[in-house]
Amino acid sequence: MNITLFCSVFILISLAGLSVSDDVPGNYPMSLYGNKYSCGVLGENEYCRKICKSHGVSYGYCFNSRCWCEYLEDKDVDFWAAHKNHCKNDKLYPPKK
């Protein structure tokens, strides 16, 4: 009886943990040529972090041999779109009137 109760409680707690997932939205950024950035060192690395910062987000890592940026929105996936959205240079991108 005690074992059955223990197993039931354990299964319920396990299922509750599955429903609360920590999936973070993100995207693979695209280079000037429309390709995903390749990376050789899986996991956290400085190269992917720099790529993600150039696309306007603060964190990224190598996943599936491509740089993955957490919280990268669809509008910033393309290299030039990201720079246009985040560039502070008024001469390059004059403010809209």
Curated annotation (Swiss-Prot):
Instruction: Recite the UniProt keywords alphabetically.
Output: Disulfide bond, G-protein coupled receptor impairing toxin, Ion channel impairing toxin, Neurotoxin, Potassium channel impairing toxin, Secreted, Signal, Toxin, Voltage-gated potassium channel impairing toxin, Voltage-gated sodium channel impairing toxin
An example GO CC term for this entry is: extracellular region
Question: Please, which domain of life does this record's source organism belong to?
Answer: Eukaryota
Found in which tissues?
Answer: Expressed by the venom gland.
InterPro entries assigned: LCN-type_CS_alpha_beta_dom, Scorpion_toxin-like_sf, Scorpion_toxinL/defensin
**Gene3D superfamilies assigned:** Knottin, scorpion toxin-like
What residue range is the signal peptide? 1-21
Family classification: Belongs to the long (3 C-C) scorpion toxin superfamily.
Q: How does it assemble?
A: Monomer (edited version) and heterodimer (non-edited version) of this alpha chain and a beta chain (AC D9U2A2).
Q: What is this protein called?
A: Lipolysis-activating peptide 1-alpha chain
Q: Which organism is it from?
A: Lychas mucronatus
